[in-house]
């Protein structure tokens, strides 16, 4: 009998190893982790009802686990191999994001666990972007970038062998899993030596700094890791006290009684020394630490309302003005769980209370009545995915405050999936299935 390690266990080992590596490479990220943990502890101490709810919904244990990282790759082969690598860790491609609409020349997906059980064990996810070389205006430069990318291999031979072994055997044993984590980590390690000369780097950087970040280095170095906080506004306000320079605006929706979707901020990317191929030295700015506060996942109806209000709000000159404007506009978005539920704006996970187990639902009883009677408890489903406008805002602000908008490309999910070698899953279908399955477990709704 084979004794294979579970994908969840391998994912946990990998996320812990990546966190340790990133704290060594970017010490300020370790400081950020300390700040977030202190803020979370304070929130839980001051809000016992929130703590009790997180415990009841099995959310508390996963709170202090890292929530996501982000990488960028240059070729279809790199993306397809990453899909196979992440499959070893139980992470599947979910969602398609076209960041070119916001002036960033990439399109993306999120590799993440999809089952409720896997998300509870470790919700680690990696936002993965593929460079769109066709958005480089200069044909000569585009061809040069493609040639540079064709010469590199971002995976070690041992990593490729272990992926193949996993595919043949259907799993990895303990020692092989450790070796896999060690080898996979090399793909995401920072290298201060560029694969190009300074002139090429500058030419690509002038097209877009992100293009230089993808093309000019030997691997797809992790460009940020992101812990989860319960109060992102407090973290943002405390960052300067910890010697951390925050980005100007918190991305996403405003502060609310019932948080929705995803709010994100970060510290500004570090300027790091680089040695180029002709021996020249310079600097590169790309890597940073991010913080996120996750709320309830929205239905298509809720998401349409969110997108409309966000567009109406625009962008404020500073964070205080921006948040005030958002708060004003988002008064039109219901801010209590009952309204979100009854207007079908958000997804919920339903479970029987002790009272409900003693007196199970009977045919014909409405969900609203069962909730009012305390026989069914409705927990908001945590949003597990990303927001393209927020992701683009984070990327732009950490590639320098100078805007580098390019001509937007047409969204091409088909091209992305062809490069990936597989379809991406629809996040809305996953949330809908989770809500429906929870209703079935309660004895209402059809399987």
Regions found by a protein language model. Name each.
Residues 1-447:
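Extended, well-ordered protein cores
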């Amino acid at each position: 009998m084979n004794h294979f390690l579970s994908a969840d266990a391998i994912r946990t080992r990998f996320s812990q190893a990546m966190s340790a590596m990133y704290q060594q490479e970017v010490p300020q990220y370790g400081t950020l982790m300390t700040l977030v943990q202190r803020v979370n502890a304070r929130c839980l101490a001051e809000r016992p009802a929130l703590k009790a709810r997180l415990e009841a919904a099995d959310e508390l244990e996963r709170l202090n686990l890292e929530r996501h990282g982000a990488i960028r790759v240059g070729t279809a082969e790199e993306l397809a191999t990453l899909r196979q690598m992440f499959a070893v860790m139980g992470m599947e491609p979910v969602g398609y994001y076209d960041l070119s609409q916001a002036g960033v020349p990439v399109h993306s997906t999120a590799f993440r666990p999809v089952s409720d059980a896997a998300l509870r064990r470790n919700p680690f996810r990696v936002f993965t972007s593929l460079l769109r070389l066709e958005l480089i205006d200069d044909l000569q430069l585009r061809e040069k970038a493609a040639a540079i990318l064709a010469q590199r291999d971002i995976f070690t031979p041992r990593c490729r062998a272990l992926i193949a072994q996993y595919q043949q055997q259907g799993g990895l044993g303990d020692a092989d899993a450790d070796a896999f984590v060690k080898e996979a980590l090399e793909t995401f390690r920072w290298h201060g030596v560029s694969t190009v000369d300074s002139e090429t780097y500058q030419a690509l950087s002038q097209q877009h700094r992100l293009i230089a970040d993808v093309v000019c280095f030997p691997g797809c170095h992790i460009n940020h890791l992101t812990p989860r906080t319960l109060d992102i506004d407090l973290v943002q306000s405390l960052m300067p006290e910890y010697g951390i320079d925050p980005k100007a605006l918190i991305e996403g929706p405003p502060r609310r009684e019932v948080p929705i979707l995803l709010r994100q901020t970060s510290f500004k990317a570090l300027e790091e020394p680089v040695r180029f191929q002709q021996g020249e030295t310079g600097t590169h700015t790309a890597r940073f630490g991010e913080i996120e506060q996750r709320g309830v996942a929205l239905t298509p109806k809720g998401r349409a309302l969110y997108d409309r209000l966000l567009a109406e709000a625009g962008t404020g000159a500073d964070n205080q003005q921006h948040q005030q404007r958002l708060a004003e506009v988002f008064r039109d978005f219901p801010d209590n769980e009952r309204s979100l539920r009854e207007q079908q704006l958000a997804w919920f996970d339903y479970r029987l209370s002790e009272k409900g187990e003693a007196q199970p639902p009977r045919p014909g009883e409405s969900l609203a009545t069962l909730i009012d009677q305390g026989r069914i408890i409705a927990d908001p489903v945590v949003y597990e995915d990303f927001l393209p406008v927020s992701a683009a805002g984070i990327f732009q602000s950490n590639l320098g405050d100078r805007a580098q908008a390019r001509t937007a490309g047409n969204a091409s999910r088909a091209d992305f999936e062809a490069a990936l070698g597989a379809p991406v899953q629809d996040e809305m279908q996953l949330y809908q299935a989770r809500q429906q399955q929870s209703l079935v477990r309660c004895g209402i709704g059809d399987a």
